[in-house]
Regions:
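FIC/Doc superfamily catalytic core
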Residues: 1-300
């Protein structure tokens, strides 16, 4: 059996888990100590990054600059023809609608503002039935994610909670990694069978809602989305080129938690630095001035 790049000896695994828990604890502590202006800037970036992550997870290919132009309604999201991913505007609308109900008021308020600012072109212009079907599909994904998470018992232990989440994802008909389906094709007299990729797993909905689960368990000060937290490679099965070893999964899960928590903490630190620079650039402003809010929105 080929050794796995993820398989670690027990002492190294323990160190990795300690790093993951330390990163999550440091993030939570920083959130609790953060000033309101810092939290607003952090949430602005988090919401934007979440929308980008959702679209890319669904298979849409674009640059950050193109995303901003598309969001503002001045360009299409990509010059490439649409693939298997779900319609981009419908996805953004589903995310923003759900987050307007977030228990974190800062995020809920920003989601409502993003809803009003979303000027991206419609996905099914002139086809009301297709548009309605796409909205129902996106809504059903969010409902399924909420139901799956609600069935998991809250626990103050982050890593066991994540392992249970991954197990539930692997057993779920909607969120499990898609299987490649064989499809026969004909090229003249030649007949071939090719494998087509299935529709991407919409685990973005679980990452969007997971912060509410940890918040209700007392693990996080605020219900953050955690884009990138679910790793489908922790749910792999045996393949001829890579025999699957169950011991890999805890390492992959701990690595994901560490990396995501560290990334969010870095974003929060940058938001605090930016908030201080904005404050220093506005000496003597009136308390009723709208300039701070405008600068925060532009900076975010």
């Amino acid at each position: 059996m080929v050794p796995s790049e993820y398989r670690l000896p027990d002492p190294v695994q323990r160190d990795l888990e300690a790093e993951a828990l330390l990163a999550l604890g440091r993030l939570d502590g920083a959130l609790r100590a953060a000033r309101p202006a810092t939290l607003r800037l952090f949430a602005l970036r988090l919401l934007r990054d979440l929308l980008v992550a959702v679209l890319r997870q669904e298979g849409h290919a674009f640059t950050d600059h193109r995303f901003h132009a598309w969001f503002a309604g001045v360009a299409t999201l990509s010059d490439l023809p649409p693939r298997l991913g779900r319609p981009p505007r419908v996805l953004c609308e589903a995310v923003l609608t759900e987050l307007t109900h977030s228990s974190w008021e800062v995020l809920a308020e920003l989601a409502a503002r993003f809803q009003a600012a979303l000027l991206a072109p419609g996905d099914h212009i002139g086809n009301d039935l297709a548009a309605q079907t796409a909205h129902q599909d996106a809504h059903s994904i969010v409902i399924a994610a909420r139901d799956l998470i609600s069935e998991l018992e809250p626990t103050p232990l982050p890593l066991p909670a994540l392992e249970r989440l991954h197990c539930a994802v692997g057993e779920h008909v909607l969120f499990a990694p898609p299987e490649r389906a064989p499809e026969p094709i004909a090229m003249g007299s030649i007949r071939l069978t090719v494998e087509r990729a299935g529709t991407p797993s919409p685990h973005w909905a679980l990452e969007m809602l997971w912060g509410e689960h940890w918040h209700s368990a007392g693990l996080m000060a605020h219900a953050l989305p955690f884009p990138g937290l679910i790793r489908l490679d922790a749910l792999r099965t045996d393949t001829p080129s890579h025999p699957w070893e169950p011991d890999e999964a805890p390492t992959i899960v701990a690595t994901a938690l560490r990396d995501v928590a560290q990334g969010l903490w870095c974003n929060l630190t940058e938001a605090d630095q930016l908030a201080r620079r904005l404050e220093d650039s506005q000496p003597g402003r009136r308390r009723s001035s709208r300039a701070p809010a405008l600068l925060e929105l532009l900076a975010g």
